[in-house]
UniProtKB/Swiss-Prot annotation:
<feature type="signal peptide">
    <location>
        <begin position="1"/>
        <end position="27"/>
    </location>
</feature>
<keyword id="KW-0130">Cell adhesion</keyword>
<feature type="glycosylation site" description="N-linked (GlcNAc...) asparagine">
    <location>
        <position position="34"/>
    </location>
</feature>
<feature type="disulfide bond">
    <location>
        <begin position="47"/>
        <end position="107"/>
    </location>
</feature>
<dbReference type="GO" id="GO:0061041">
    <property type="term" value="P:regulation of wound healing"/>
</dbReference>
<feature type="disulfide bond">
    <location>
        <begin position="247"/>
        <end position="293"/>
    </location>
</feature>
<dbReference type="InterPro" id="IPR003598">
    <property type="entry name" value="Ig_sub2"/>
</dbReference>
<dbReference type="GO" id="GO:0016020">
    <property type="term" value="C:membrane"/>
</dbReference>
<feature type="disulfide bond">
    <location>
        <begin position="148"/>
        <end position="202"/>
    </location>
</feature>
<dbReference type="GO" id="GO:0043184">
    <property type="term" value="F:vascular endothelial growth factor receptor 2 binding"/>
</dbReference>
<keyword id="KW-0677">Repeat</keyword>
<dbReference type="GO" id="GO:0035020">
    <property type="term" value="P:regulation of Rac protein signal transduction"/>
</dbReference>
<feature type="topological domain" description="Extracellular">
    <location>
        <begin position="28"/>
        <end position="326"/>
    </location>
</feature>
<dbReference type="InterPro" id="IPR036179">
    <property type="entry name" value="Ig-like_dom_sf"/>
</dbReference>
<dbReference type="GO" id="GO:0007156">
    <property type="term" value="P:homophilic cell adhesion via plasma membrane adhesion molecules"/>
</dbReference>
<comment type="similarity">
    <text>Belongs to the nectin family.</text>
</comment>
<feature type="glycosylation site" description="N-linked (GlcNAc...) asparagine">
    <location>
        <position position="70"/>
    </location>
</feature>
Length: 390
């Protein structure tokens, strides 16, 4: 009885092993690989066959529409192309992959039992160049708020602000739109007129970019009140010379109108105005006076004055020779004064040190003199004592 039970157990175990082996063999008849593709690119979907015996192979899309039936096209979507069908593998190419193509593709093998594997297709959406929006017009002394936007990415992109190669910390928000994300990064900072025209950069990074960055540069537009400055074409002029006065203007918005006037008088008839230029083709002594240019915009106004002095030929030569010598003379006088001060200090220090030395020397002589006198007096007394005893 015992040998019979042992044989029965062996048959049972062998049957279990055969079933497990058969199940393993069947599970390996078809295999699929998960793939990832960038939106708009081409991707390959593969179904690997094991122990293929010519049975029917069907490839279906995520909504279970049949793409290929045993190598024959079944769906009129020409973006799907069968590129290989052998006893080991079935390969199809999907061109211009879209987000709607994402999902599980079924590799089905019809034998005595139906076996299938799912190849999961993941479509990632890289960001375009980010958009930059400004909340309101910036004015000097105020703040500016800029928002960088990446409206459609998958997975969510990372946005950063940079200025002068230094990152600016901002506030980031994320909004989900179906399978994609909209990302924003906002910054605020104080601005002055010197910031007008400076560049800030918004940078987007994403796994699909493979280490590259998408950037958008924004030129700061900071409005400020105008300034005016008159610059002459030459500083010294004489009767008959030509002179151009230019009113150099800054401001945002830039002033479009420049008003030239003459203090307490009208402009000379010969003077010509061409925008920021006030020209005198031929000067004479009657053109002497104070000239002014005035500009304005919505943030303020500004003006500058220039005193015009027209010399005759002799006066202009004298003025040209006196100005350099006056400057040089002033410099030389200052140097002489400094040298005299230094000499006085040196002499005072020298006299002070010498007086101290003479005082000490005199004190020493007095001491030696007293000692010598005492010695001599002592000698005389001794002689007197000797004479007395004799």
């Amino acid at each position: 009885m015992a040998p019979a039970l042992t044989a029965l157990n062996r048959c049972f175990v062998l049957g279990i092993l055969l079933l497990v082996t058969a199940g393993t063999a069947f599970s390996q008849e078809v295999q699929a690989e998960n793939v990832t593709v960038v939106e708009g690119s081409t991707v390959e979907i593969s179904c690997h066959l094991h122990q293929y015996d010519g049975s029917i192979v069907v490839i279906q899309n995520p909504v279970r529409q049949t793409l290929f039936f045993n190598g024959t096209r079944a769906l009129k979507d020409t973006r799907f192309q069968l590129v290989e069908f052998t006893q080991k593998v079935v390969k199809i190419h999907l061109s211009d992959a879209k987000l709607e193509d994402e999902g599980g593709y079924f590799c089905q093998l019809y034998t005595e039992d139906t076996h299938h594997q799912i190849a999961t297709l993941t479509v990632i959406v890289p960001p375009d160049n980010p958009l930059v929006e400004v909340k309101e017009q910036a004015v000097e002394g105020g703040e500016i708020e800029l928002t960088c936007i990446s409206p459609r990415t998958k997975p969510a992109a990372t946005l950063r602000w940079y200025r002068d190669r230094k990152e600016l910390k901002g506030f980031t928000s994320k909004q989900e739109n179906g399978k994609t994300f909209s990302i924003t990064n906002s910054i605020r900072f104080n601005v002055d007129r010197k910031d007008d025209g400076n560049i800030v950069t918004c940078e987007a990074s994403h796994p699909a970019l493979k280490g590259q960055k998408k950037q958008t540069q924004y030129e700061l537009d900071v409005q400020f009140s105008p300034t005016a400055s008159i610059q002459p074409s030459q500083s010294l002029v004489r009767d008959g010379d030509e002179l151009n006065l230019k009113c150099e203007v800054t401001g945002n918005p830039r002033p479009t109108e420049i008003i030239w006037t003459r203090l307490n008088d009208s402009l000379p008839d010969r003077a010509q105005i061409q925008g920021d230029l006030l020209s005198f083709p031929s000067l004479n002594l009657q053109d002497n006076g104070t000239y002014s240019c005035q500009v304005s915009n919505k943030h303020g106004r500004s003006s500058d004055q220039y005193v015009l002095v027209v010399y005759d030929p002799g006066a202009i030569i004298e003025a040209q020779t006196q100005v350099p010598y006056a400057v040089i003379g002033g410099i030389l006088a200052l140097l002489v004064f400094l040298v005299i001060c230094i000499l006085i200090v040196m002499v005072w220090c020298s006299v002070r040190q010498k007086g101290s030395y003479l005082t000490h020397e005199a004190s020493g002589l007095d001491e030696h003199g007293e000692a010598r006198e005492a010695f001599l007096n002592g000698g005389e007394n001794h002689k007197r004592k000797e004479e007395f005893f004799i």
